Amino acid sequence: MILSHRYTLIALAAAILSSGAHAAGASVTASWGNVAEPSLPADSAVCKTLAATITPVSGSIDTVDGNPSNSQPDASRIQTAIDNCPAGQAVRLVKGSAGESGFLSGSLKLKSGVTLWIDTGVTLFASRNPADFDNGVGTCGTATTSNTKSCNALIVARDTVGSGIVGDGIIDGRGGSLVTSGPNANRLTWWDIAYLNKTKGLNQQNPRLVQLYNGSAFTLYRVTVQNSPNFHIVTTGTAGVTAWGIKIVTPSLAYTVPGYKCAAGTTPDKVTPATCFTPETVKNTDGFDPGQSTNVVLANSYISTGDDHVAIKASGGATRNLLFAHNHFYYGHGLSIGSETDGGVSNMQVTDLAMDGNDSSGGNGLRIKSDISRGGKVNNIVYNGICMRNVKEPLVFDPFYSTAKGSLYPNFTNIVVKNFHDLGSAKGIARTMTFLGYEAKKRTNPLTLTLDNVVFDGTQPAFDVAHNGGPASPNGTHFTFGGNGPVSFANAIVTSSTTDVTVTGTPGTAAAVDCSNAFVPLKSVAPTSPI
């Protein structure tokens, strides 16, 4: 009976997302089969329509909820609509009769088979009252010495089957707004609190925006997610996640200026409360983080944020079968695996990725990171068709991510980078690469890496220096040249039995990947973007 109910919910969810008039018919091919583009629900599949009552001004509603007693006026009616909605139907948030476009809520819980549809021009704003997210620990909205998490996410889906969040509207976490209760009330923004991790080594207790716990068949479609106080979208133990056409923009124009050209002395590294934010100063704002999850797709999406664009994690459980197809990344710390890999990460494909890092000081490209406190097997990872520019560290394979101690040894094997073209830096910033296996403490876990048609324009990147107790790069790396295309830095690789660096094969002569049409301005698809 339980299994029958589970598959009924999946079927109902499939019906709601395929019966509308917006189906595009596109699909991507994953290792486990074709994955079709979702669609918006049909009008007949809407169980409840809720109209907005708040009018934002320049993307802000801070004048509405200065009094914490009015911090989540829409939470009850949205939650009631979700609770009363039958499986296979959607709750739709729309504009009000006079053009009102804002909803304001604390933490919400999705249920199985129900889709939250945020309509075009509508924004679901998160409360800035930490009490609306506190999970009972009592420290949400502060920075603590304890790493115990104390905030619920804005939207939580726990053990759901066939749920989703769709629409051309926005979910806004308001990370740059002052919190309104607790010891930091009217003193610090969420992002100021997060910056205390850097300045004082404290753990910020800030809410995420979307958090999945277990469950299956979850859909994110076309929605914009921005200004999260912490991570934007996290899946934990979820089987089957499709994120298609989403946009992650942090900070948005509501909290910065065009081009992120903040005036001196206005950012959280210089003043609190800060009045202007850049990607470099909004800490721990990962974009899309699949953890301990399987059959995950991120396709045709756009991400610009202050931390990892993507962080694939495997903490205590495996993550496998992932596809990243036709995506555009901007500011951020890379398409990352790790740092938690002890459960194992395997079978991941990245195809047709454009990365424009805007010469950010913390910019990373393709990245696998771990250390002996949380390391494990990372195997069968293929990056194919990558266009990159203005990224400080384009290729990073690093098992010495930190100096933490332990006996969980990183092991990166069967990594393939092919049809990769880096156009260099508009500002002439020097690039570095890291190629390291874990060969220490009587362990020999070489990085096994195939390079084929990997081309850097201009001055070739340098190899990274020794850090965190590890050796200088390259070390413990077994290179294979695929033979179809060139490897522009091949002559810089020195084989040595001392460093356990080997090379098999020879580069080919195929033309570099054509990146002339790869890059698009983020604001052309996400109007709230400053770039």
Curated annotation (Swiss-Prot):
Its main location: secreted. One of its GO terms (cellular component) is extracellular region. PROSITE patterns: POLYGALACTURONASE. It comes from Ralstonia nicotianae (strain ATCC BAA-1114 / GMI1000) (Ralstonia solanacearum). One of its GO terms (biological process) is cell wall organization. This is Polygalacturonase. Monomer. It is an enzyme of class 3 (hydrolase). GO terms for molecular function: polygalacturonase activity.
